[in-house]
Amino acid sequence: MKVRYVGKSYGVDSMTDGKVYEVLEVDTMVGALRIVDDSGEDYLYHPKAPKPNGAKEAYGRYEIVEDDASGSLRKAIFG
């Protein structure tokens, strides 16, 4: 699964506007996407309001590039 982040760039350890990121899983227990970000590590990000840890406001949104057969990303982001 893959998403494109659209919004304010966070810096070298988070996400960059327009870049496509791999989503390792949709964690339904905590309601988050596990994404490999610019740091090269995987972190949990809110599916509807992506922001770096500790930030007070969301900076952007996701566009789905590639979903699984069950539509897991669509459900998490738009559902």
What do these predicted ranges mean?
Residues 43-79:
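Intrinsically disordered, low-complexity, charged/polar segments
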Residues 2-56:
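Basic/aromatic-rich interaction segments and small domains that mediate binding to polyanionic partners
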